[in-house]
Every structure is written in structure tokens, then in C-alpha cells.
Amino acid sequence: MRLVTFGDSYTNGYGLSNSDKWRGHGAPNDFEDYYRRMNSWPRYVAEKLGIPLINMGKCNNFGNNDIYNLIKENMDELLSDDLIIIAFSFPYRNLTTPNNDYKAIDDLLKNYNRYYFNAFYPMFNDEEPIDLDFSRFIEPNYTFADYLRDSEKLTNVSYFENNAFYGYEGVQEGGLHPNLDGYKKISEFVYNKLKNIC
């Protein structure tokens, strides 16, 4: 079994760099891209599960339809016992709808052990789900960013890049990415949700 993850910048690891050279730039060189992917939340989930990892997270406004296309391009690489986790992006980055994106991804992966999370914006916040199976969607109205915000309130520790706290004046919702502690915190959330069901 392997952990295979798909998602946007929240899965890729955007926000990890300490270098001002890469802050605000979604398309780094290969070295920086590997650094991000190897230190984002999927790494720590895979370590907790004791299985290998393939992190397919992408930056540059990578939307849910883009996630679908990336999965489709790589179907031949997936193994029947892979654990697949999708962290959904902002639902309106592509010219598709949340209902269509969710159904297309769920149909594509119907024969796999898969689970869905929201990265920073609830996929169905602005649209009612129609005839969809949410049995594999973990907390459809909650996001990784919500979890980090709630954790910050309890610990008074910043889990976002540049040591910013979520929700401070001047910081727009969804405009922050996790720092290393934030990605580790997300991995705890994901692992705790999955450990009893997979």
C-alpha cells in the first residue's frame, strides 16, 4: 500500500520556504518543488501510516478539474491497494461546478480506497450537493485552514507562513498557506480522521 495524494498548493507544500526568493511564486525550480512536496502534510501522514508516499500536489491556481485531469493522466500508475487522499481546492478555479468535479473524481476513483478533504474553502459552500455520495468526504463543511485557525486559538502558535495568524486584519481568507508546523498539524488532523476507517 502507498499513500497517493492529489491537491493544490496546500498539498504541494506552498508556504514552506524560508527564502524570500520563492515567496509569492507558485512555479519554483525542481529543487524547491521537491522540497515542498517532501515536507507537506502528506509526508507526515505517510510516516504515521508507515507506507511510501507519492505527493501529486500542484501550485499555480490548480483547481478541482485540474486534479481530476491529473488523476486521469496517472490512472495506470495507481495500484489497487493505494490509499488515495484528495484535498479539494477552491471550487471555482476552473469552468466547472463542484457537483460535476466531485462526481467525476469519485466516479474515476470508485474502485480505490479514497478519502476527500477540503484544503481551505468548503467545496459545497456556495452550491448544494446533488445526488452525491459523501461517505468518503471527511467533514465536507470544514477545511484544513479551519483546523489550523482553531488550533491557533488553543495554542497561540502560528501555523501559517510568515508567522502570521489566520484572520488578522489585512489577511484575506484563503490567502495564507501553512508553515512547517501547520503542515505537521494538518497531518495530525488527517491521520486522526483516517486511523479508524482505513
Where are these regions (language model features)?
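Serine-esterase "nucleophile elbow" of acetyl-processing enzymes
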Residues: M1-G63, D76, P178, K185
